[in-house]
Amino acid sequence: RMADVNGFRQEFPAEYVNTVKNMIEFYANICFPDYSNPCFSDAKLGDRPAEIRNYQEWLKLFPDCDWIRYYATEGREGSPLPNLSHGALTSGFFTFRNGWKQDATVMVVKAGPKGEWHCQPDNGTFELWFNGRNLFPDSGSYVYAGDDEVMKLRNWFRRTSSHNTLTLDEKNLQTTQSVTKLWNPEGNEQILVTENPHYEGLKHRRSVFFVDQSYFVIVDEAVGDAKGTVNLNYHLCEGTVNVDDKSHILTTAYDGSSNMKLQCFAEKKASMREKEGWRSTAYRVRVPRTSVSFDVDKKDSEAVRYITIIYPSKNAASFPAFKAKFLNKKFDENGVKIEISVDGKKRQLEYKL
């Protein structure tokens, strides 16, 4: 912008200008329809008017860009990005999306390479927006740095178990170097398969299926010789959540028409545990929320495997009944095959690498 004002834009190569535009495009792809952004790592929750002003400034740089115009004018002019789901494979951010308006379903998954100080050890975590509400917001950062008491608070929000991912004995990840095994953003069974060497002796493979562009099936596999308690952690937004620890079911009862049902099916005996849950909405501001983990005692080298169905719905009064099971009887490096049932309608989901 300053180069334009001073008449020096031509001094910058086209590649540089394209890089700036690509950065804007990446940001648009990971944001939700209300212009808010995922609060991964040390990110702050964006302010809608400020974000719209940003797009208005960017439109001055790229006046012929239809999709920047769309976001700068709140959809009154231009057109949205031509894609729905989007993967940034180098940085490891993946978006499942069925639309650009308020009633859209949008999941953003963070599964990239090692980051530095501002990056939290949260590989495999996600946020999920549905019909105007972020149902699984990140814990955020709460505070940055200070004395021992301040760092205790910071470390609670940045720790791995405060995110929507898998841990062993609730310990922070030793390695944060996710590898994308498969990314298919098209069709009625969109798939992401990502793998991270969480700990010495234990890797985590997470496979996400976006089914019929309406609900999600997540397969988590903890593989290796390490022993301990495997925890599959989920953190919901604030509000009323009904917890059925016997059936491993969470159903939300939020005001409005954005709710969901989650049910976890563990291959081995598992216990569902409610635990302390918070999310930070601004610096030094936090609100309580429902947080749970599904715990499995891992005593040997056999993989610990889970299937989770997350079903967003506008109607909190009635959710479908779920069943799920693995069809491949043990962990397979080359793929997975499962069967799910939604209100009695069976369906097989699978991939091969």
Predicted regions, residues:
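Carbohydrate-active enzyme catalytic cores, enriched for enzymes
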Residues: 1-136, 185, 299-305, 328-353
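A generic "binding-loop/recognition-motif" signal
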Residues: 23, 141, 226
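Short loop/turn segments at secondary-structure transitions that flank enzyme active sites
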Residues: 33, 102, 115, 132-134, ...
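CBM-like, beta-strand-rich accessory domains located in the C-terminal region of large
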Residues: 42-44, 48, 52, 146-353
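Active-site donor-binding loop signature of nucleotide-sugar glycosyltransferases
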Residues: 111, 139, 168
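Catalytic-core segments of enzymes that bind and process phosphorylated/nucleotide-bearing substrates
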Residues: 129, 142, 245
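Cytochrome P450 core scaffold surrounding the K-helix E-X-X-R motif
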Residues: 137-139, 145-147
